[in-house]
Amino acid sequence: MSNPEKAKNFDLMAFIGRNSKEIRWPEIKASAQELKKKYSKVGAIGYCYGGWACLKLAAEPSLIDAVSTAHPSLLDKAEIDAVKQPVQILAPENDFAYTEELKKYTLDTLPKTGVSWEYIYFPGLQHGFAARGDPNDPKQKEGLERAKRAGVNFLAGYLH
């Protein structure tokens, strides 16, 4: 969040309560279904909160053709297990949400799915780097730019 005043007053737990998976998944799924009616190929990029949704989409081939996520949050092992479409994960070194345990699980599990996947590690960067990294900090700026290029290139490979 770029506005320090809003960031200070942001109540994460209230946000998650108002936007739980149970509340938002039906809306996300319906949106993907509508897009698939209009377009032959559909992709999704989800940063942070959108990460779990991308992996749930990737479990349903009729909904999506490929997904990319950076520093996913609220992700669980079952969502990783269920992947059936190409997935890209952009993982910072330091992430309270996409934990070391989940990173290891991802790297152990995705090769067994038979699905095309890509995992890109961003050393020295934190959760949120791809969405709200500091463009005035050279390391964070590089991460922002690299993540953007990686996501676009990954999806372009599956959507054209």
Locate predicted features.
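N-terminal cap/leader regions of alpha/beta-hydrolase-fold enzymes
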Residues: 1-160
